[in-house]
């Protein structure tokens, strides 16, 4: 899919996770600073045809309606372009990280559609037209670590993914769930082993 899906759905896709996938993507909103450079003062908010000119269309491959719904469900309706752009970075990070983390079981590979756009766009990029990295860049980098810990929302389990970091014994894994104000809501620590080329 090229539209945004809830994180769990990337882990439970009926087709695609069992093979190399040559392109996947989702809306990927640029930073607010880049939006100020892109949109006219009249067109920056609310979302309108000017957004569509920069690929943020509610229908078609981009499917930005689902992106808006995920923001509203998780954080409430944004009241400004600045608030939308800030919330979108959280959603983009979660979505892109889940997209890559969901591939860890079968290890079949994934190419991102795409790294950058040829003009100011709100979709399918890891850095924007102005070379500003988006949340996607950092999420993909994190999800692709040679030795990585992740939460699998389909099984509600924490997994240690070891792509190529060698075998490690006696690692300490610490999990924290944070509130929106960054206070710790829950945490747990465990000692784990990780064999090379495994997801446990």
Locations of regions flagged by a protein language model:
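Substrate-binding clefts and catalytic carboxylate motifs of secreted carbohydrate-active enzymes
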Residues: 3-169
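Beta-strand-rich binding/interaction modules
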Residues: 156-200
């Amino acid at each position: 899919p090229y539209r945004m899906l809830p994180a769990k759905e990337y882990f439970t896709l009926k087709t695609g996770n069992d093979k190399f996938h040559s392109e996947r993507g989702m809306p990927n909103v640029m930073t607010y600073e880049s939006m100020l450079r892109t949109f006219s003062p009249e067109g920056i908010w609310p979302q309108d045809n000017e957004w569509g000119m920069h690929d943020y269309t509610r229908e078609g491959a981009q499917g930005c309606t689902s992106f808006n719904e995920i923001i509203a469900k998780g954080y409430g309706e944004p009241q400004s372009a600045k608030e939308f752009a800030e919330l979108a970075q959280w959603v983009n990070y979660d979505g892109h990280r889940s997209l890559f983390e969901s591939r860890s079981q079968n290890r079949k590979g994934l190419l991102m559609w795409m790294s950058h756009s040829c003009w100011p766009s709100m979709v399918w990029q890891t850095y924007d037209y102005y070379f500003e990295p988006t949340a996607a860049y950092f999420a993909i980098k994190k999800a692709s670590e040679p030795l990585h810990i992740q939460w699998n929302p389909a099984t509600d389990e924490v997994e240690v993914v070891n792509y190529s970091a060698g075998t490690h014994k006696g690692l300490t894994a610490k999990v924290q769930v944070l509130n929106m104000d960054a206070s710790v809501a829950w945490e747990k620590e465990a000692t784990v082993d990780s064999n090379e080329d495994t997801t446990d």
